[in-house]
């Protein structure tokens, strides 16, 4: 009986911590003059707490495991909502594809530039110099 209570306590603690970060993010988002989703701010709060080891990862692990395990099921309502706007998406297919392609290329360029800026140019292992 004690072991099952301990497992239940771990799940309750995990979900309380996850939801506390979510609601803290929603509260902070309501105070900001710009529109940022509260769930994104809540994820950042949870990330900072975990990265700084203020919050042990083992405390939120059971809840995160459950959410990740059933993540596909959580996307079903979103897919149904998108299907309601199928005609609009079909009419705007070209601009959507072009904007996705351009934004992907911009991300590639920015990441490669920033990686080169941070890490610098590195020599290939085993290569002493460029042969002409």
Curated annotation (Swiss-Prot):
InterPro entries: LrgA/CidA (IPR005538), Uncharacterised_UPF0299 (IPR022957). It comes from the Bacteria. The chain crosses the membrane at residues 7-27, 31-51, 63-83, 93-113. It is found in: Cell inner membrane. Signal peptide: none annotated. It is a multi-pass membrane protein. GO terms for cellular component: plasma membrane. The keyword Cell inner membrane applies. Its main location: membrane. Keywords: Cell inner membrane, Cell membrane, Membrane, Transmembrane, Transmembrane helix. It holds the Pfam family LrgA. Belongs to the UPF0299 family. This is UPF0299 membrane protein YohJ. It comes from Salmonella arizonae (strain ATCC BAA-731 / CDC346-86 / RSK2980). The gene is yohJ.
